[in-house]
Amino acid sequence: SGTAVGNFYPAIMEAKHANIPLIVITADRSHEERLYGANQTTDQIKIYGDKVKWFVDLATPSNLNGVDVKLYLKKIAAQAYEHSMFDTNGPVHINFPFRKPLEPTQLDLTEYRIDFKPIKVILPEYTFDSKYIKSLIDRCTSSSFPILLLGPDAHREISKDVLTKFVSQLNLTVFVDPLSGFKSDISDRFILNYDVIL
């Protein structure tokens, strides 16, 4: 159905706001059938707008003559994975256009199964040197009212025990985002609903 892609939208919005890596794959009409009102055709180009981190509209399979299709698809898969995981996690969208026949046909997938190799994607890691950490500690201790903001999914980056010790030693007031994964019962210095105060 041309409207089926709309059913993914709530999940994509949730993934966007919760920083959840998600790869959305949709099937589409061929490029030449999109603009003249073919049955059940919805414009799927960037249909999710800024709710996805990355979008690609692939070439129609019959237009890939002379192209190593397996390599082409592996590269797209690697790019999709990288975009969904790098920097801030989030959803990405791959749109696959097809020409008729769309119904199931006989297809030998043996070569794909035998030649399958895992995709290797190297994602950079953020690291901080000791000078930066020392500078951060010095600024916190010299401040009259140091504040720490725990953003969405902060629980994935720091453990409860380490956070509690850090807050206690540096005398921090902590503003806790509802999506951070932490609760105010950890310490009396943790403040929920800080946006109301601000």
Regions found by a protein language model. Name each.
Residues T3-G6, R29-R34, T41, L64, ...:
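Short gly/pro/ser/thr-enriched loop/turn and capping motifs at secondary-structure boundaries
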Residues A11-M13, D28-I47, K51, D188-R189:
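Active-site-proximal loop->helix
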Residues V24-A27, N95, L172-L179:
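Short internal beta-strands
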Residues T41-G90:
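Conserved thiamine diphosphate
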Residues Q79, H83-S142:
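Conformationally flexible catalytic loops at phosphate/diphosphate-handling active centers
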Residues L150-L198:
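Glycine-rich, anion-gripping cofactor-binding loops and their flanking helix/strand elements
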